[in-house]
């Protein structure tokens, strides 16, 4: 199921989309599936499943810790795809967030085939740019998958337009420079970046990197189509509070995008 369904539904309801990230295989494969399901039950509209990777260039310390734990426990591509399948079976659009190396190792066409077979909506590829994505563009077209690329405040107008044009599902706007992580204040650069993207495409724009509470989610949803939350949600599992804390934070964020 394409994530566009979630954006259309939210737009009809006059609210933002809540995109929630958790890595596959943390705290275990089954435990990770349970956590994502809890997040969905508490109000996440689109799930972003992380593919743990050993060299995560934009992941902040919280997501790195969870990914390292998953890798140490032996999580593999088959486990990641099983996670996607289990979550997508519930009817929630489910994207996979992955660095490009694991997809290349698996085989781009084969990965697209198996992701589609698992019910996955598509990929978010933080270290792949459209200029270097010919194989993925073809495979995503062949299997009807969404493809989400990232834009940043530093993106030139030409790069931003080309990236937005290549996206399907939504455009991922990184609201701050640097690695991921919850922050006390959302970036002042985010509204201007969203406006630049909207001048280039009619595809929805979701903002990630930094949101940690309902108030910030409401702020971002006031100018963007979607709010992406990762580190704050992963932190609920890392800090030992577990599913109750995850449910509570997700419900707060879901209320924020609806306010």
Feature annotation, model-predicted:
Residues 1-21, 84-88:
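N-terminal amphipathic alpha-helix/helix-capping segment at the start of soluble metabolic enzymes
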Residues 29-39, 155-165, 200, 207, ...:
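Catalytic cores of alpha/beta
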Residues 35, 40, 46, 51, ...:
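Active-site beta->alpha loop and helix N-cap motifs at the rims of alpha/beta catalytic domains
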Residues 44-56, 118-124, 129, 171-181, ...:
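Glycine-rich phosphate-binding active-site loops on the catalytic face of alpha/beta enzymes
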Residues 60-95, 138-152, 188-205, 246-259:
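Alpha-helix-loop-beta-strand connector modules within alpha/beta enzyme cores
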Residues 63, 71, 150, 160-199, ...:
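Glycine/Thr-rich beta-alpha phosphate-binding loop at enzyme active sites
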Residues 72-75, 119-132, 146-155, 160-161, ...:
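Catalytic beta/alpha-barrel core
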Residues 195-203, 212-259:
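Alpha/beta catalytic cores of nucleotide-metabolism and tRNA/nucleoside-modifying enzymes
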């Amino acid at each position: 199921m394409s994530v566009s369904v979630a954006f259309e539904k939210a737009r009809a309801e006059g609210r933002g989309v809540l995109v929630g990230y958790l890595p596959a295989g943390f705290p275990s494969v089954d435990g990770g599936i349970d956590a994502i399901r809890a997040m969905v039950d508490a109000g996440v509209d689109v799930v972003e499943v992380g593919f743990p990777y050993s060299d995560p260039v934009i992941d902040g310390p919280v997501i790195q810790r969870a990914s390292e734990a998953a890798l140490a426990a032996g999580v593999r591509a088959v486990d990641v795809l099983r996670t996607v399948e289990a979550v997508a079976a519930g009817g929630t659009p489910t994207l996979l967030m992955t660095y490009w190396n694991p997809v290349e190792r698996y085989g781009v066409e084969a990965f697209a085939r198996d992701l589609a077979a698992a019910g996955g909506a598509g990929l978010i590829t933080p270290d792949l740019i459209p200029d270097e994505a010919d194989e993925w563009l073809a495979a995503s077209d062949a299997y009807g998958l969404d493809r989400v690329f990232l834009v940043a405040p530093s993106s030139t107008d030409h790069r931003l337009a080309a990236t937005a044009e290549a996206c399907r599902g939504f455009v991922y706007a990184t609201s701050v420079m640097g690695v991921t992580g919850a922050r006390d204040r959302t970036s002042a650069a985010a509204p201007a970046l969203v406006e630049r993207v909207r001048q280039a495409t009619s595809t929805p724009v979701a903002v990630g990197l930094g949101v940690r509470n309902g108030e910030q989610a409401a702020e971002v949803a006031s100018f963007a189509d979607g709010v992406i939350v990762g580190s704050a949600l992963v932190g609920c599992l890392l800090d030992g509070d577990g599913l109750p804390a995850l449910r509570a934070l997700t419900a707060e964020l879901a209320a924020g995008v609806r306010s």
